[in-house]
Design a protein with these regions (language model features):
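Structured soluble/peripheral alpha/beta segments that form catalytic or ligand/cofactor-binding pockets
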Residues: 1-371
Length: 371
């Protein structure tokens, strides 16, 4: 049966000007119909083992993004970050990271009715592919890798089950739309790398979506992404400081208990009436990023005055997972990833422990386009 809708883009076909919208309601389907030097979008999947001694983790981002063409950045790419536990012959060493960018020549996304299926064909060999498939009701997702660097699957099972009523994108910040298709999921990872190493773990994770109408350096001063787990709780948080809106803090947070979303907020101002989330940097820990930011974690408060509920979680960085400079010296601006310890729960109730995936970046100013 033919797909209900198809979005195909190639790395050499770029719209000169704003990308037209697809007008598709499902958050896993592309928001933009074409590649454009001004519009871009990303699908993000993460997972982390809940064994604090392991630090096994994944973060995979699928980019349709031509905003970096002027500086030689491939418009179709998959950013792959893996962290393998226990390096060394005895397995007791520090975790080992695997990072690479897979460049694609073509990205095809199909709405097949019961699933949104995306295939990314390698620029090196079109027979080599990476795919992701979301169930239409968001009950699960599967990532499949058939690349020289890595082969295998990562399977997500939505802890909240599926739903016939699927929320789409919502405005997050000026020129930025955001969605959290899968807040809390169980994850099974089974990957084998070219050198024979393997990453196999059962953990927790989820999936996010973001679509922007300008290059990120024009929109944001900094950006923080956290998906944390502690006992029955999972929280997904995106926090950005807007460059267009004079430093306004923009935030979107969801909190789930046993898979059921019990709290959603898009406000960071403390209120006696409205749901809000308070995000504060933590300092004094043993692990912090490699750039200007000196925080060693985050302190998160999810507050619902109307329900009389307050949840608090401490996120303490455990391992610096990746470190990507985003500007030349002397400015110490860049993108850090962490696996982090989580502790917390409902204030006055039982305290739970777990692990999180954290990304934090500070953006340089947009460089001038070469003439």
């Amino acid at each position: 049966m033919a797909p209900l809708a198809t979005s195909t883009v190639t790395s050499t076909t770029i719209t000169q000007g704003p990308a037209p919208p697809t007008h598709h309601a499902h958050p896993a389907f592309p928001a933009h119909a074409t590649l454009s030097p001004t519009h871009w979008e990303v699908w993000v999947f993460d997972a982390v083992s809940q064994d604090p001694a392991s630090n096994a983790a994944l973060e995979i981002s699928f980019f349709r993004d031509a905003t970096g063409l002027f500086r030689g950045r491939a418009p179709l790419r998959i950013a792959f970050h893996a962290q393998l536990p226990g390096g060394g012959d005895d397995g007791a060493g520090p975790p080992e990271a695997v990072h690479f960018d897979e460049v694609a020549d073509e990205s095809v996304v199909e709405d097949r009715g019961d699933a949104i299926v995306s295939t990314w064909r390698s620029a090196r060999d079109p027979a080599r592919t990476t795919t992701f498939e979301y169930a239409a009701d968001l009950s699960g997702a599967v990532l499949t890798f058939d690349l020289p660097e890595v082969r295998g699957t990562v399977t997500y099972t939505n802890a909240g089950g599926g739903s016939s009523a699927v929320d789409g994108f919502a405005a997050f910040a000026p020129k930025i739309a955001y969605a959290q298709p899968m807040v809390a999921a169980g994850v099974e990872a089974a990957l084998t790398f070219a050198d024979g190493r393997a990453l196999r773990f059962a953990g927790k994770g989820g999936g996010d979506r973001c679509a922007m109408q300008a290059p990120m350096p024009l929109l944001l001063d900094e950006n923080t992404y956290v998906r944390g787990h502690a006992g029955p709780y999972t929280f997904a948080l995106l926090r950005s400081v807007s460059r267009l809106d004079r430093g306004r803090e923009c935030v979107r947070a969801s909190l789930a208990r046993d898979g059921e979303v019990v709290f959603v907020a898009a406000a960071s101002d403390v209120s006696l009436a409205d749901d809000h989330v308070v995000v504060r940097a933590a300092h004094g820990g043993n692990v912090r990023g490699t750039f200007a930011d000196t925080s060693s974690g985050w302190r998160l408060d999810f507050v619902s005055p109307a329900k009389g509920k307050h949840w608090h979680f401490d996120v303490q960085h455990q391992v610096v997972w990746w470190s990507i400079p985003l500007g030349p010296p002397p400015a110490k601006l860049g993108n850090n990833g962490f696996t982090s310890r989580v502790s917390g729960g409902e204030v006055g109730g039982e305290k739970h422990e777990g692990m999180a995936v954290v990304g934090h970046l500070q953006m340089p100013q947009m460089p001038a386009t070469k003439k």
